[in-house]
């Protein structure tokens, strides 16, 4: 008897491969790395900075994301590397996806509490929050099948 496939199971099968995920990882992980380099070197024009960007508390808040974002980049880029070299990429991909979603959620939570709405900050952070949710079920399903 053939096992009945649900919509979620089919979605999980499609989202458990590195095929499309690697593009997301490359964009997000290289984007984070670029953002932090540009931020550290003060290369962004003032018009693109968040409100009160000179306030030391907000500067600290922004830099508090650095370890999280760099860990996202390291795990995401490593999972792409591991997938090409026969390694166990799924665990690192799952870590990267969860941390990416957390990073987006934390930023949006702050902007919500601050009562600030700027599409330039909301759109990318909304994508960081949501896009991993399409891949996490498939990665988890793939990990369950391997164990």
What are these regions (language model features)?
Residues 105-122, 138:
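Membrane-helix boundary connector in multi-pass membrane proteins
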């Amino acid at each position: 008897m053939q096992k009945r496939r649900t919509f979620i199971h089919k979605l999980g099968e499609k989202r458990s491969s590195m095929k499309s995920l690697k593009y997301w990882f490359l964009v997000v992980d290289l984007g984070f790395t670029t953002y932090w380099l540009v931020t550290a070197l003060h290369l962004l024009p003032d018009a693109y900075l968040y409100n009160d960007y000179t306030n030391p508390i907000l500067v600290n808040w922004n830099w508090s994301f650095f370890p999280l974002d760099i860990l996202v980049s390291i795990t995401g880029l490593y999972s792409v590397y591991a997938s090409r070299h026969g390694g166990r990429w799924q665990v690192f991909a799952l870590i990267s996806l969860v941390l990416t979603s957390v990073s987006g959620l934390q930023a949006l939570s702050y902007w919500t509490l601050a009562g600030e709405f700027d599409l330039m900050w909301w759109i990318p952070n909304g994508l960081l929050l949501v896009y991993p949710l399409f891949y996490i079920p498939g990665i988890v399903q793939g990990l369950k099948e391997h164990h």
